[in-house]
Amino acid sequence: MSTAVQVDDVMRYRDSRFQTIAAKLLPTQYLVVDDDTALTTTLGSCVAACLRDPVLKIGGMNHFLLPEGQVGDGAPARYGSYAMELLINDMLKRGAHRKRIEAKVFGGANVLKGFTSNPVGTRNAEFVRQYLQAEHIPIIAEDLCGIHPRKVWFFPTTGRVVVQRLPHAHEAEVAAAESAVRARLSKAPVTGGVELFE
């Protein structure tokens, strides 16, 4: 049975490295699957949380740009607080049990040159750790901070994660892509809502 939720037209392709269908998440996207689809993304200062219920073999990934926003600044999906709620709520709606959910978190590199005081990558990493601790969701693996962008593949049915640290040559490309998304989202209207589960 395959009941993948497709959010914002997540691109799917055949991944030749792992010989499976993969879904490539861009900033602000998330996806929950219960099949052999690999969830993949490329991260600079952004963070991806990979959540899984190991009993149901259901899991998902999100990709957020900033920890939290200010009231009324638009495009809430770019913020970790919103992205985490969307991912957790979707898993719960599909039968995941909150007490079984476990997390693996990645990204938060400090790739934006010149931002040495309270860099966004460090803030994103601190946010995801604190958020998951507050939600009582254990982090069973992490690769956060540092200076290198990463490509992440997550296989929700098995829980396997592969992380490839990208060479410095990719830093400018990843940082430019993240900055472009931030600029586009700052002009986007606020849409949708989120239902919070206690």
From Swiss-Prot:
Gene3D superfamilies: 3.30.1330.200. It catalyses: L-glutaminyl-[protein] + H2O = L-glutamyl-[protein] + NH4(+). It holds the Pfam family CheD. Keywords: Chemotaxis, Hydrolase. This is Probable chemoreceptor glutamine deamidase CheD. The gene is cheD. It comes from the Bacteria. The keyword Hydrolase applies.
